[in-house]
Amino acid sequence: GLLRRCILFITTDSGPMHVGVAMHVPVLCMFGASPIPGFYPYDERSISVRAPVPCHPCRIHECPLDGADYMMCMKRMPPDLILKYADQMLAEHGERPAYELPRPKDFETRVAEQADGSFVLAPKGAAGRVVRPVLPAGIKPHGFD
């Protein structure tokens, strides 16, 4: 019940992210060790971001790095990007709780490489139409098309 009262859910790539999507809450998800193409939120209200670090996605639940590099995938998450998307999502959906929002449209997505080398989540079969940008820098397509 608590998630359905949220106007925006900023979370990590975890179980609560999927619960938020299931409750139709706009979800802004920060990806650390997990690959975005395997675990990204799957409706039109979701945005996924990752830090531009060379070890992403390591798929390791216990970071093997030490010192300043420990958990760099989360520590180097660009705060300005998170705030930008949070502001954008609040502007799109208003400050109404999820239970007051209309049910999101269902669509299948794919990870599509753009001419500039960045990647986006786009609906399958929608030539050239971008749904949500994904922070560039090393996301590799995983055969989702």
Task: Go through each PLM region and give its residues.
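Accessible peptide chain termini
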Residues: 1, 144-145
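Donor-binding and catalytic core of enzymes assembling or modifying cell-surface/extracellular glycoconjugates
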Residues: 1-32
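Nucleotide-sugar donor-binding patch of glycosyltransferase catalytic domains
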Residues: 21-143
